[in-house]
């Protein structure tokens, strides 16, 4: 779980977080899940020639976050296969659910071709789920 401060630049004219900015917060949550392990994204690319890209996203905006709020992004890897990672993510303020999202990520190589996770990477990802 990581905490994020909402800055003025994140908000719309009403002082609420602009809807597209929640996607940035979700991305940070998924990245931080990787960073808490033994790799980062650049190391994954160098070692495995792999990049993770979003294939689909389902997001429910339940309540707004506002300028200067401190929000938390909770991320869990719910389903892992050789060609797909399914994340459940929540954005919370003071134990109140603001956003609930399901994000499906797929592995591609530097040419943009979908690839399968090898055994080492699959086992590693199983440890963070």
Please report, for each region that a protein language model flagged, where it lies by residue:
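Hot-dog-fold acyl-thioester-processing enzymes
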Residues: 1-54, 109-129
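HotDog/MaoC-like acyl-thioester-processing domains
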Residues: 2, 35, 66-67, 78-129
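Generic structural detector for well-ordered beta-strands
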Residues: 3-7, 58-60, 104
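Acidic-enriched, low-complexity/disordered segments with a strong bias for Aspartate over Glutamate
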Residues: 10-12, 69, 100
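Short amphipathic alpha-helical "recognition" segments used for binding
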Residues: 28-31, 59, 93
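Short, positively charged
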Residues: 43, 49-50, 68-70, 86-88
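Alpha-helix boundary/capping detector
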Residues: 48-52, 59-60, 101
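Active-site beta-strand->loop segment that positions catalytic residues and contacts the acyl thioester
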Residues: 55-70, 76-82
